[in-house]
Amino acid sequence: FAELFGPGSRAEVPLTGRIGDQIVSGQLDRILVKENEVWVIDFKTNRPPPRIEAQVPEVYVRQMAIYRTALSQIYPGRRVRCVLLWTVEARLMEISEELLEAAAP
C-alpha cells in the first residue's frame, strides 16, 4: 500500500474526458502515475466485500473500465491498472484487463 499512498500519489482527482460521442466525468479516489503505468484506486465499502473478481458488482467494473479508457487517452502508451480497495478489510483487488476490456465503453 505504501507506494499507492505515498508522496507520488494524489487523492480525490477530478477526471473528465470524451469517449466516443459521450462526455464522461468522475472523481478518482486515488491515482499514482508512474513512468510506464498509471494506477487508479477506487475505495469501496461493501460488507462483506467480494472474495473474487467474478463477484465484483458489474457497475464497479464498468466504472473502472470508463476510468481506464479516459486515462489511456491522457497517458498514451502507459498501462492503466484499475484497483478496488475494500475498506472494511483494507484489501486491494486488481481488476483484470480481460474484465475491463469486456466492460469497456
Predicted regions, residues:
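Structural signature of nuclease core domains in nucleic-acid processing machines
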Residues: 1-105
